[in-house]
C-alpha cells in the first residue's frame, strides 16, 4: 500500500469588495477580490538535480476583478454581460508531498512553488419575460483556463543512486471552454401550484494534452511530452438540468420536488 505524508503550516488570506451602481439606463455590479497564499515551505532548486539544495517557495498574490452589467431593452427584456478572473490553488498533496528518493524508486514529489490555476470568463446573454410567470434566458460564454497541472516525468543522474527518475506536477497545461446556455424559468402560480427551472447547455472543451502512451515513453527516454490541442476527457458537450416543484403553502402545507440531470461526454 502507498500513502501520503506531509506536515506544513501554509497561510491563506482573502478579501473582497463589491458595489452595485444603478443608473437610469443600466445597472452595474463591480468588485475585486484579493487572495494571498504563502506556502511557508521549500522546493527543489533544480528539477534536474532534485536531491540537491532546496530554496524557499514564493508567496502568491492574486487580484481578481469582476464586473457585471444589465441593460434593459424593454420593460420585460434585459441584456446582460459579465467578465471575471478566478483562481484556484493546487491541492495540498501536489504542493507538499514529501520527496523520497532511493535506489529503484520513481516517486511522485510535491512542488510547493506551483502557481494557482487561473480562469478568465466572459458571458453575454439576454433575458426575456414571456408572461407573469414565465421567462427565458439565453447566453453564450467563453472560459480561458491557464496554469493547469500536468504530471511530468524527469530523468536525471543521481549522485548517490545513478540514473533515476521521478514525477512532479508543473503548471504546463491550458484549456478553453466555449458554449451556449438556454434556460426556462416558471414561477409558481396559484392554479397549477407548480414552479420549474429547465436549462440546456452545449459546450466544447479543448486544451493541450498528452496521448495515452506518452507518459510511459517519457519515463523511458526523458523526452518532453508531445502536446497538441484535443478535446479533453472531462468535456460534457450536452448538459440538461431540470427542477420541478409542486407546493401548497399554509399550516398544513405540503410540497414535492423532482430534480433531473442528463449529460453526454
Tell me what each language-model feature is.
Residues 1-74, 100:
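Signature of Gram-negative outer-membrane beta-barrel scaffolds
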Residues 2-5, 47-56, 107-112, 165-171, ...:
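Extracellular loop and loop/strand-boundary signature of outer-membrane beta-barrel proteins
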Residues 11-17, 63-67, 110, 120-124, ...:
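Hydrophobic, lipid-facing positions within transmembrane beta-strands of outer-membrane proteins
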Residues 15-21, 32, 67-71, 124-128, ...:
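Residues on the lipid-exposed face of transmembrane beta-strands in outer-membrane beta-barrel proteins
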Residues 17-25, 36, 63, 71-75, ...:
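Outer-membrane beta-barrel strand-turn architecture
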Residues 25-28, 76-79, 132-136, 191-196, ...:
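Repeated loop/turn-to-beta-strand initiation elements of outer-membrane beta-barrel proteins
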Residues 38-47, 71, 75-121, 142-167, ...:
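Surface-exposed extracellular loop regions of Gram-negative outer-membrane beta-barrel proteins
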Residues 141-144, 155-156, 161-264:
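Gram-negative outer-membrane beta-barrel transporters
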